[in-house]
Amino acid sequence: MSEIEFNSKFFSVFCSYFDPHTMYLSESDKSDFFSSVSANNLSFGLNVSVNEKDEIIVDEIIPGSSAYFTEKVTAGDQVLKVKYKDEEYVIACSSISKVEALFNSTEYKNVDFTLRKKSGEIYTVSLTKKLLKNYENKVYSYILEKDNKRAGYIRIPSFYGKFENGKTNVSEDVAKEVYKLNEDGIDGLIIDLENNGGGSMEEALKLTGSFIDAGPIAVMNDKNGKKKTVKDPIKGSIYFGPMVVLINGFSASASEFFTNTMQDYNRAIIIGNQSHGKATMQTVVPLTSDRNPKEFIKITIEEFYRITGKSN
């Protein structure tokens, strides 16, 4: 077990003892986390998996990526080794965490990959990370029609923001979709937050403020017990018609923040199962003061309460 793997296991258990939402993050873990709450990611364009023989196999080539334009790499190819500058790692002899870092870290942008096709042919390609859109983690909308009524539907997979590589954020994207739906003459709006585990609380604040006219939207409680009232940062509303918000047991944190305020202001009807129940806010900070830190901690910094005083 490498030092990084040991630290990850030990400190994760240590942190969770004090707070279930605080966790240790390696550089690769941090990149994975920000990728999950971003609509844009730096990527070579290779989606890979580890098979039962601990071999890394290419599952998919992302269109528009560096791997795609080689016209050489195909699904089913096996990654044998990777090389970055003078560092070379043979997959069979290397820590999987190091290989993950090469794929996920923003530090490694130009890497040589040696792969083997099913035919046995071995070849090497030089790949460069490009900023690619994560279409699975981006807002989209369409119109549902029945009995001459038109309902706009907006799916929000996460509260993504302009983190490490992001060029867009959820509040702006939702505003664009609402504008388009309004132009098409909708009679009502459905916001789908099912399976949305949260993301940027700043984006949750902006999105919440976009659907109420003005007023307080939450009460924050910091580590010292100091409370502050958070007011609507966006004056006015982007939509005034009837609304429905869909949630389930996997809707958490920022999703609950938005949903609670819509309910407290009688702004929307909430439909679905009981949500996850996570009313805390985290931030990611480095554990060292190095210029390029390798270890981080995602730590709880505040609790948030509804304007009614409830936590959920």
Which stretches of residues belong to each language-model region?
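Terminal targeting/pro-maturation regions of precursor/exported proteins
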Residues: 1-9, 13-20
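GHKL-family ATPase ATP-binding module
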Residues: 9-11, 15, 75, 188-190
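Cleft-lining beta-strand/loop regions that shape enzyme active-site pockets
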Residues: 22-41, 50, 57-62, 66-68, ...
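Structural detector of coil-to-beta-strand junctions
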Residues: 43-45
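Structural motif
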Residues: 76-78, 310
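Metal-dependent DNA phosphodiester-chemistry modules and their immediately adjacent helices/loops
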Residues: 251-253, 295-312
